[in-house]
């Protein structure tokens, strides 16, 4: 404050009246989802870019056989193949399931940060040098389009 300075107070009314709420509700949208929160899942079958858009059908089938849920990497969400609410990783969710299947996931550090505390990690990738194998308890190197259906059928025979 400047000593001795004076200011004029001007009252201004923008036209508001107490009886008007000044808000118009245009629409009410309730968010409903059919998915389970992947953070609560005991078994996750997670797919990456290597699965491709059409490959998520076989992942869903494997998850159903195991009583698990499907999740994915950021690359999958960025490509618009799966919704963001099932994304695992630094920019997704951190999960700690009993079993985590990393299928077609290279193992970028951002993804690993969201799943490395899983009790058991099974990785399936065609690249034997993929970083995901560094954190996996079990690794299968090969064509996921052949391995996943075969694994699903074998598990279907023993899991009732």
Identify the role of each PLM range.
Residues 1-160:
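N-terminal glycine-rich FAD/FM-binding segment characteristic of electron-transfer flavoproteins
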